[in-house]
């Protein structure tokens, strides 16, 4: 069977309703994406702390629907638009999707990723290219963080250079658990991973088990009291600013903090908020993203 992809870009207030209508009318699957992804106008993921709670799509949204060949895209979209009360049918693009081995195709798109001096992130269907490398086995999944995004890479490079055996590490916004797992493999103990998404927490636990890395995961209300030698947070600039006091308070005096999910143009603003608590600056930039790193002052 052949398939078609119907791609529609429209305003935030209609994206979720159109998605539901397309599914009701027979679409096989529908996803909503940020139409400005990987540009300076990219918006934070929804559900992050400090964001508008009822915001369910991006300001400039892209709806992508997978249709079987027996559905006419224009007719289906017109019906969906009418169902949700749009005055006119949005502009759209149709892409032909060839029938193929989707599992094999997906796997072929994810190769082992070298990071830093000795780290390899390796999907389960591959062998590590270097038997002496520090290997993290991680498959692409629902939780963010496979090492391919610049912010994940930056944090991993920083951890590789910064973690000393026996140091305590807090990974706040742990996603897939990739940073917490790396910290553990670098000798940190204990390592704590926190995320607001229960699905991410479960994914991180599974990834840690697969990598034989003992990490404790939980939701924010389960974050332990006390301070850590190292705190790392790869989130986004808005929640990072909102949580500055809390995150800084988790760092021991003289301990270190690394922040990413920050675009280069946002670096000064984020650094200014954290400067109240830590001596912080841009550690490294990659593809328009930065990692900020700093040390908590002995007293403040």
UniProtKB/Swiss-Prot annotation:
Subcellular location: Cytoplasm
Reactions that this protein is recorded to catalyse: L-lysyl-[protein] + 3 S-adenosyl-L-methionine = N(6),N(6),N(6)-trimethyl-L-lysyl-[protein] + 3 S-adenosyl-L-homocysteine + 3 H(+)
Gene Ontology CC terms, in alphabetical order: cytosol
This protein's UniProt keywords: Cytoplasm, Methyltransferase, S-adenosyl-L-methionine, Transferase
Function: Methylates ribosomal protein L11.
HAMAP family in the cross-refs: Methyltr_PrmA
Family the entry assigns: Belongs to the methyltransferase superfamily. PrmA family.
Name of protein: Ribosomal protein L11 methyltransferase
Organism encoding this protein: Burkholderia orbicola (strain MC0-3)
Classification lineage: Bacteria, Pseudomonadati, Pseudomonadota, Betaproteobacteria, Burkholderiales
């Amino acid at each position: 069977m052949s398939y078609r992809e119907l791609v529609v870009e429209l305003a935030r207030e209609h994206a979720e309703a159109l998605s539901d209508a397309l599914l009701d009318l027979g679409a096989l699957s529908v996803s909503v994406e940020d139409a400005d992804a990987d540009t300076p106008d990219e918006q934070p993921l929804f559900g992050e702390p400090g964001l508008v709670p009822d915001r369910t799509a991006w300001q400039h949204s892209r709806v992508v629907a997978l249709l079987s060949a027996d559905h006419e895209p224009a007719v289906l979209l017109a019906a969906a638009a009418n169902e949700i009360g749009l005055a006119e049918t949005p502009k759209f693009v149709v892409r032909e999707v060839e029938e193929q081995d989707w599992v094999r195709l997906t796997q072929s798109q994810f190769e082992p990723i070298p990071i830093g001096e000795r780290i390899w992130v390796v999907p389960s269907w591959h062998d590590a290219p270097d038997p002496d490398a520090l290997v993290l086995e991680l498959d692409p999944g629902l939780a963010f963080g496979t090492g391919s995004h610049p912010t994940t890479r930056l944090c991993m490079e920083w951890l590789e250079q910064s973690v000393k055996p026996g140091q305590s590490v807090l990974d706040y916004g742990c996603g897939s658990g990739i940073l917490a797992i790396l910290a553990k493999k670098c000798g940190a103990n204990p390592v704590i991973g926190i995320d607001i998404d229960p699905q991410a927490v479960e994914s991180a636990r599974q990834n840690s088990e697969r990598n034989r890395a003992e990490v404790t995961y939980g939701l924010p209300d389960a974050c332990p009291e006390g301070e850590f030698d190292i705190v790392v947070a790869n989130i986004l600039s808005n929640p990072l600013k909102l949580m500055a006091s809390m995150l800084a308070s988790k760092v021991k005096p003289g301990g270190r903090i690394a922040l990413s999910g920050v675009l280069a143009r946002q670096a000064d603003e984020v650094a200014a908020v954290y400067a109240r608590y830590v001596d912080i600056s841009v550690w490294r930039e990659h593809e328009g993203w930065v990692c900020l790193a700093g040390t908590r002052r002995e007293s403040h």
